[in-house]
């Protein structure tokens, strides 16, 4: 593999963006590493002609909207927060298949961005698409592993011109670029584009989504604490999933019947393959009682 030079890539990407973005542009900013890096590059290229749109789909992490807004302000990226949660909840009503969820969310994202682009006068849509996104989404001789909402979910009648400045980069290269650009989320763990909708197995209703939102927050915080205390190595990705099966348990001396939450942790060196991480018993002793209270 050729050595990745973030300084050289930044210079070339900004020059290319100055040529490509001949009019006002908006960027889909999720707060993740990929979209934030793309936003910083585009902002350096076209400055005030870029508006970052953060869409609150209702399937975001706990406190995410406030976090992303603060981060973009610190980075000097002009942005707008759009609450489209009701639109996304309605679009996923009755949907249980994760692949269908991804495609519906992809189309809804574009429709929201088209509305915002009309208000702003934007002609271009910048996205933080990276190599694993289009590889996993299939096409040609490649099998579809999973459709990424920013690839397989894009509608054919999209009105904006697409610009993807980091499309050829892999996750480790994006993180290296983020560190060079002094982006605070450079080592933030990956979060799926469709959000918690794909961490709710079955229908992602607002109520079920809130359960997994709280569970993810607890599981992630406790795992980060365990890593700091030397109980375990911090995994590459770690989160909770709501299983569509209820189970019987005992709380005190009383029968309990409630949701089933799974906690998953994996290591990955390329952001495309993963190996399960053995979670220490001491972590589960600390975390499970809190998750069970959700």
Task: Tell me the role of every PLM-derived stretch.
Residues 1-286, 293:
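ATP/NTP-dependent adenylation/nucleotidyl-transfer catalytic domains that generate, transfer
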């Amino acid at each position: 593999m050729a050595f990745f030079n973030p300084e050289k890539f930044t210079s070339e990407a900004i020059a290319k963006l100055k040529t490509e973005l001949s009019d006002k542009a908006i960027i889909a900013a999720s707060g993740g590493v990929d979209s934030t890096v793309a936003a910083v590059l585009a902002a350096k290229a076209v400055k005030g002609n870029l508006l970052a749109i953060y869409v609150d789909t209702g399937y975001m992490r706990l406190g995410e909207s406030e976090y992303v807004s603060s981060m973009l302000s610190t980075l000097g990226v002009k942005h707008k927060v759009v609450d489209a949660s009701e639109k996304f909840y309605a679009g996923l009503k009755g949907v249980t298949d994760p692949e269908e969820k991804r495609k519906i969310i992809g189309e809804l994202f574009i429709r929201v961005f088209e509305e915002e682009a009309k208000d702003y006068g934007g002609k271009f849509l910048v996205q933080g698409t990276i190599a694993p996104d289009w590889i996993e989404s299939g096409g040609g001789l490649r099998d579809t592993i999973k459709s990424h909402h920013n690839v397989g979910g894009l509608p054919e009648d999209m009105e904006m011109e697409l610009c993807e400045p980091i499309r050829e980069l892999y996750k480790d290269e994006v993180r290296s670029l983020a560190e060079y650009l002094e982006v605070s989320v450079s080592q933030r763990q990956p979060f799926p584009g469709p959000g918690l909708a794909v961490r709710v197995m079955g229908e992602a209703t607002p109520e079920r989504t809130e359960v997994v939102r709280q569970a993810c927050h607890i599981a992630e915080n406790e795992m980060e604490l365990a890593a700091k205390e030397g109980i375990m190595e911090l995994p590459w990705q770690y989160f909770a999933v709501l299983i569509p099966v209820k189970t019987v348990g005992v709380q005190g001396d009383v029968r309990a019947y409630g949701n089933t939450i799974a906690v998953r942790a994996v290591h990955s060196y390329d952001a495309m393959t993963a190996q399960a991480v053995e979670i220490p018993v001491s972590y589960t002793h600390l975390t499970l009682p809190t998750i069970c209270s959700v």
